[in-house]
Amino acid sequence: MALCVGLTVAGTAIAEVGYPEKEDLKFGFIKLTDMAPLAIAYEKGFFEDEGLYVTLEAQANWKVLLDRVIDGELDGAHMLAGQPLGATIGFGTQSHIITAFSMDLNGNGITVSNAIWDKMKKYVPRKDGKPVHPIKADYLKPVVAEYKKKGKPFKMGMVFPVSTHNYELRYWLAAGGINPGYYAPHKGDITGQIKADALLSVTPPPQMPATMEAGTIFGYCVGEPWNQQAVFKGIGVPVITDYEIWKDNPEKVFGVSKKWADKYPNTHIHVIKALIRAAKWLDENNNKNRPEAVKILSKSQYVGADYEVIANSMTGTFEYEKGDKREVPDFNVFFRYFATYPYYSDAIWYLTQMRRWGQIADQKPDSWYMDIAKKVYRPDIYAIAAKELIAEGKMKAEDFPDFDKEDGFRAPQKHFIDNVVYDGTKPNAYLKKFKIGLKGDDKI
């Protein structure tokens, strides 16, 4: 169902940046809890405050969503962080897509079927009768080997070739010594299954639990509420969250075409302002607004899952095995830790994973990674929106990075499951640290 919003023009905001060149907007999203900033900006009137009439429309899958942004049927959308990058470099449909807003950190999990968990759990260390976390793919490796010995493919699902989920699942598997396979676009092979120990394929998020229940896949990596849904249905066990694979990893972004952004620069800034306010609302006062957010998201026009299923992760907990509910306060982060700022280093990490698994077929110099990051990630636009909000008294300067000093690179990040340190200024050196994966001039 589409949602339409009216407006009351907020004079000061529009006077500062300039009126929106386009007021009637249609944004796309996938039914996942991390579309929340769009829903909250709509429901709380933040779009209205910026002089915008907005329609929010659920899309069938990530490909349809991206194609509709490229074709101009959508003004912008909730996107996988890898989508603007993949489109811009031409992996899949080529189109220059940009982002000036990161929608969230974390928010995904990896779930396996009950049958796989039964085989896997005997290898998992236990304390006080419960599995010790994080659960590494090392404990899945003997199960995959058993399938291989019997000549059976070990199949898992992820949501899109350039999704965080694909790269997180691959990262987790490879850290446990399981090769998730390679892409070879230069040879016309975009299955991602060359030399694979585990075969990964695309399944739209809402279909993950049913696809696993049918036995088509044995596990998957997806966002919420589709891991918790497996627990509620009693068909699977989430074994790890992406927070445990890479602490505070960037997840979704708000993407628009470069052509659209150039044509409607003021509109774009007003949209980013509304989304920043929505993200702040979602995290403020130690997540006190989350129960209300869950109620909104459970509506059929948004995520449309049961309140309890969405609340399981959105309110700071996460259930692994049935009854094994643990505190994960940062499972969903929308504003803390400068979550909304589009860091170049985040973009470069995604590009390194595209290279690692062959989506980028040839070696590229470090300068290439930086150039693409700057083409796609636009902290300059974000800074204009943030400064407007500060000037209007809606936000404080400390809510944001110091724009005079910020260079777009996070400090080297150490919190990965394999303890490999990531420094976004040295992408090729980073790739050389991995035992499994392409590096240097490697080519499939």
What is each stretch, according to the model?
Residues 110-111, 253-256, 260-261:
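Short glycine- and hydrophobic/aromatic-rich loop-to-beta-strand nucleating segment
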